[in-house]
Amino acid sequence: MASSLAAQLSQIAANSTNQLNLKAQRISHSQSLIFDRKVAGSQDFDTIYDICNEGFQELCELDPRFAQFERTIFSEQSKVQERTEMNAAQNKELDAVLETFLALVGGKLLLSPAVKAVEWLVRRFRIHEYNTEFTILTFLPYHTTPLFLNLLSILPEDLTPTFKILNPYKKSSVNPPRHPLVHSATTNKPFFAALNRYTIQVSKEQAGHHALLTFWAGIVTESVAGMLDSARSGRRNIEKENHDDIIMRVLPVLNDGLAMKDVAELVIGCYMVCVAIAQKASLHDKVLDSLMEAVAESWTEETVNSGLVCLAVLAQKKPDTTLPKRVFKAILRLENPLQQLSETSKQHRASQLLLGLVAGCVQDLSKQKDTARLDFLSLMFESELLGEAELGSGMAIVLRASSNSHKDGAMSLDAQTHLADLVQHFSRSESLRPIFQKTVAESSFDIVAIEQNLQTVIESAPAPKALEDIEMEDAEKEEEQDNFAPALKSLTGSSFKGSYLSTQSIPVYDNLVRAFALGIGAQEKLDAFANLPALDKGNAAKSPQYLSFFVRVFSGSYPIGTRVAALNMVSSFLTTASIDMDLQALLPFVLVTLADPSERVRREAAGILTIIGSLHKNKKGDAPGGVWARDTIYGQDKQPKNIQWTPGRDLQKVFERALLPGLEEYVIDPDHIGRVLEATLRGSSVSDSESSELKKAVRLSFFTCLCSHAVHVPLYAPKLGLLKLLNRVEKAGGTTRTKELGSLLKSWREMDGQQAKDVCEKERVPVSEMESQIVLTVTPKERDAITVLLSNVSPYSGSLSPSFVGAIFGRMKDVWAKVPEDRQALAAENLFEISLEQSDSPLVDGCKDVLRSVELPGAVLSQFLQKIPSTVTDMEGLGPAPKRRRTSQSNMVAMTVKDEAALSELMEKMTFILELVDSSSPETHPELADGLFQTLAALHHFKSQVQSGMSYLLSLALGSLLAIVNRSKTIGKPQFDTSVIRADLVVDCVRTTDSPQVQNAALLLVAGLSVIAPELVLHSVMPIFTFMGSSVLKKDDDYSVSVIDQTIDQVVPALIQSLRNQKRDVVSGTSELLLSFTAAFEHIPSHRRLRLFHALITKLGTQDFLFAVLSMLANRYSMDKDVLILMTGLVSDANAPVELATYSKYLGLVSDSLKAKPGISQVLLGIGSDDGREPQKVAVDLLRALAYLFRHSSLKSKMAKAFAIVEGDEPQQIRALFSQILEQTLAIGDNMQDMKSVGQASGEVLSALFGTLSLVDFLDTIEVLLQRPNDELRRKVLRLLEGRLRQNPERDSPSQTRMLDFLSVLVKIVESSPDILLKHAAVACIDRIADKYGKKDPSKVIPAARVVASEVCIGQEDDRIRIMGVLCLASMAEVLGQAMIPALPDTLSRSLALLGLSLEDGKENTRLHDAVYSLFSALFVHLPYMISASHLDKVLVLSYKSAMNDEFEEESRQEALRLMAKKVDASATFGAVDRNWQHAVQAGPEATKETLEVVSMAIEKHPKSSTAKNLPVITNILFKAFDLRREQLALGSDATFDLSDVDEIEETINEVTIKMIYKLNDSTFRPIFTKLLEWATTGVSKKDTQGSLARHTTFYKFLQVFFGTLQSIVTGYASYIIENVVSVLSKASPSNPNTKSLWLATMRLLKNAFEHDQDEFWQSPSHLTKIATPLISQLAHATHPTTATLVINEAIPAITELAVAADSTDNHKELNTVLMRYLRPSAGPTGKAAGGENPHTRLAALKTEQSLTEQLGEEWLALLPEMLPYISELMEDEDENVEKEVRKWVKQIEDVLGEKLDDMLT
């Protein structure tokens, strides 16, 4: 009860927001997104509000939707709102506002204002605590940013399981990567649901943003895929259940997401999830259909492409090809479904989707009200959308639907015709025919039924099946519905008077055609049909009804079977009837039918042609009955004069000579009739057959007859067929088709677009094809063909069809080239005038398009160009008054435009003209150059008037000129009059425009002109380079690069040649050019700089110009790294003599710049000019850049290669130039000694210059320079040598020999020079030489060593030379080894003296101190045997002194002492330590520790034999060290060691002793141990209790380590100490400060001794009995909390280990008996004290029992019976802590035994 209440109270406290808990409030207030905790904690809400409100106001400017929060969470009132004071309803209302704000601000969290605004929500409303889920999800899309890390740091520690994934990242303060989030969404249902819930909510609020929606889509898609993968099972039913569960969780999210069409990214994300589900799970067909419908209904223009891909994936998973109707209709409603499906199929396999569309198109054929679906179906097959396999499947679907169409009722004639055409397309197409044949062959389609249903013939179908198969099929056929009889009956009462060709819309005709189509295939039905009153067959010879009906059918767009049947009906009638009339009215329709694609149709038409021909042959002239239907063929309203009829005799000639000879070819080839008519009407024969040409009159009569029919026939299907035939003939019998068919063009023009579309659609004639044939009636033979065509669209009428206008202009383009040039000029002028009309009509656009598309003559282009200057002149009146322009400050006053429309018109006119010129291959019209330059001048003039750049116009004019100039360059001479060239205008284009295109074109033009007419260009060229430097060179596109290259290649050589011709200095003459390029350096893209400058220098001449470019770059950019790299690249391409000559000129320029009256440097570097820099600074920059070039160029390798070549004078040139450069450098240094910066820079050059020499050459040069009297130069030279040696100098044999020989020069300097700095430099060089080359010949180094060790070097008073000398000796010791011995005496004596000097009080010298120790380190390593005992003593004593001084670094000293311990003979080391131990102790703890480390290292690094040999001295040292505690305590207040120092040193001593023990055997060590025991126990007088206590403490601390380290090996040694330990236990106490350390050491040594007993030592009663009672009695020391803690921590582990070691029930009983005494305050009824009087003692005893129970378990609990009474008593103990602990013990016992103690305790 009590504990439960306590838990509840603690939970309430944890969740409490007590306002009096100020610390908690401060912590909460300091949690911030943007401020450090300390800063945040110091801010008040006014300050925070001001900062955050500023961000909020900026947000409002970005998005006005934030303004609503200004009245709520960002109001002034919000500063005093405290959530803890608000009730639940208010908090809920606040949460809603906060979540709305967070949703809106989520997309802007990477912006600073948004973070500031959210900071207010954190600080004031603590959203991270109260709205944790919404806050985390708002920030989660940015989980990789520092902002999210800031949020993690302030989130509560107890995150809900939803976000448990964030806990490890919160603790380690790192951003969570994406993978764990995906894993969490996959495995953590609450997280998955929360993410979806948040995304849908935010999207509904129209606050969805890219970061969230892409994050959500990616995470959810991957997690759903992961869920489905992990749900897989070997048992299908279980896997299905698992998948269904997942899908049921996801589908509501998809429904909500797909419903929000306007949130495009959310919808696309839902598509991704749908795809994942489809690919990972096996879905029911209904589920797939539902998903597909949801997708199709959700897409918008923005998401449709993704939606189609999703549909394609879903469709692939369907078992069949059917699509839901909604999906099918949605796809058909798309703006351009075929293109979109094509894009979809590129992204994903879409075969099932496409076949589903095919199936949808042919579904319910009888119910389709229009042909939209079938039109779409045809387009699908024509668009190559389907692959080969899908094509076969699609064809099979179409054929199956066609085969079964009769079962669902008759389909419409249009549908029948559509399908028939499609099937014919399958059989006729080259690409589709093989697939179609294969499909038909592999399937069991009823071909006969298909042909019957479609009224067509499948020409490429395989042979019919065997007779018996057909019979079987027939037997199985269902009884079909007979639709013919009702249709016939409905027509019985109908009648029609007139021709069925008279008009398009005849109601009875449509009914007749349907009935006729139903009757095909049964002769009796056709006979019945033919006798209908509406056909009036009885009067067929006189009235037109009968024949005109069938003519209209066979010449219309009907199925092949229907048309063939109609032809048969006509043929049958003509064969059986007695006709005495001229049937030429049928001829145009028969001729059209002979061009039909179907062979069956052509065959029947050929038959009719034969019949008509034979009738005419029999007549031998005009028919007695006249021409059949002469007045009624096209209706009563058509006057006979409108139709031109051919006389019978002439027609007979046409039949005999032209038409009938080719009957067989007509059937075979549908194009043959066209060729026959073309040849006949032109007056030539088709072949060399017997047919002869017709006379002109006959041809004219026949041609006009056909043309009149084409014009007047009201039906457009035959009209189109006739036009296709007639448009092959341009001219016949003296007339043209333009003349004969012109009225057709006019009548079509008068028809508006919709009307034209309607009339064509009625007969299924393509409008575009009809318009194309109509405009083809205008031939180029017509002189004014362009004018005729233009007259049909100009003036423009809004009723004109855009496609007709397009066809007219298309025809213009086709005939243009065949029109005479004078007519082209006239037409071009007309078209141009119309093009400039201010209208957006198709007429204007068409005229422009024609002019742009056709090839305009040069004269026309010139005429156009002349319009520009004249028009600009006319515009002068629009500008400001001339006086205003003259007095204007800039001379460019903006125009005061009176008529802006006129200005716009002018600009458009100029643009159009220049575009025409540009697109007309101006290079082929060089005569345009004059006009173009005039245009350029006009444009410049006009540009200054209107203050407009007119970049596009300029680029057009320049581009055309450039094309002309480039052609002239190719040919080699100008193709135009060069006097018209205006170079100033071209240069002006470069200078005054900001357009890169204009600049590039102008530069290329200048380059081209400089080749063909240099004398006219070069005087204007320099401003170009000035401008290039500031503008053009910075461009980085490939074209601009090419322009710059060409300009340099072509202009620069011409410029240089011009300067030379004028005998001017080329360098100074081109300084402006060079300055332009150097000034442009920083603007030039980095990767192009080197190539550009290299090209420039190459064209200018490397020998003459490289130094100038280098100096100008160095002057302008100083030590800019990029510039230096460029300069290095430029010199690397030159050979060694050129490079050196360049440097010599460069140094000459430096010298010139420092003169009182500079020369060329004034021109190149601006020295002495008003805006020039100080000469001194210029010189420094140039010299430092030169030093860089020497160091980083390839000059050294070039010189080496040159010297390797013996022949030629190049080596001599190099030596001469090098000497010259050296002299120039030294001269600058000598002359400028008063200018320190110049002197230093010249020194750098000298150093770098020497770096280019080989080592041998370098030394030769140095040796000469060292003979000069200038000490500064000599020091500089030696420093250069040292620097060279510090790098990686040459190691070849000549170099080594020369370097060692050079030592004598250096030794001489050390011996003789009074200049300490020079000596220092010489010793530094000796040091380097000895280090690098000394081992090759040590004998040459010995003299140097002696000199360095002598008085003249380290014996000097100057510390610099001393330090350098000592370091040099250290290097020599390493290199020379024993060869160093001759110099050793001086070295040792002087170095020890120097070490002593460095340690003198007040004169400490750390550098000298470290140098000496470096020397001794080297000596200890290489010459340890030469260090005497006295030297070792001095080293140790001085080291102790060094250790006492904190100013010295200990590293060098300790390293030397370690090396002494390792390398010097062990006996010498131990002896020195023994002799100087007292000095070490006097020096203090640091020295003592270092001394012990020397002993430790010596023992460790030397062999066992050495330790055994030196055992007496080692033991002596250790005994001295062990006695340190006693000695220091004896000194009292004079002690130099703190107790902590003593403890630390004793730890070291113990480690050293253990190391020593490892190197000894038992027989060797045991005497030492007994001696140590005696030393500790009896070594001091009994009166000296303090001394005895100190030695015991030290000894016992050693024993603690001894038993703990050596463990079971030394357990037996405990027998030596038992008695003494018992004695100590009786005296020592943890409560006594003097004995506490001893007591602790005793407890710990006993624990270690017990713990590692493996020899049953402590099981022995003799050992156990002695120690048990004294040890357990230590529990009695637990009398108050402090001692109780010590006893529990130290004594109990020892007692426990003893019990473990005792390992027997008897021993345990003995221990427990003693132990239980301390569990009772008295021994029973006697009332005698038992030992447990103090509750702390009883508690300690209880803790012991607990420890023993835990360690020994049931072994110890075997003693439980005797413990039970004690337990019962203790459970009633008066001390609460005792009672608490005994209950713990009882619980522990019960856990071990597995049963309750309640019964035992009652």
UniProtKB/Swiss-Prot annotation:
HEAT repeat boundaries on the chain: 581-618, 1046-1083, 1253-1290, 1297-1335, 1758-1795
Annotated localization: Nucleus, Nucleolus; Membrane
Alphabetical keyword list: Membrane, Nucleus, Repeat, Ribonucleoprotein, Ribosome biogenesis, rRNA processing, Transmembrane, Transmembrane helix
Subunit composition and interactions: Component of the ribosomal small subunit (SSU) processome.
Encoding gene, per UniProt annotation: utp10
Source organism (scientific name): Aspergillus oryzae (strain ATCC 42149 / RIB 40)
Name of the protein in question: U3 small nucleolar RNA-associated protein 10
Gene3D superfamilies per the UniProt record, alphabetical: Leucine-rich Repeat Variant (1.25.10.10)
Task performed by this protein: Involved in nucleolar processing of pre-18S ribosomal RNA. Involved in ribosome biosynthesis.
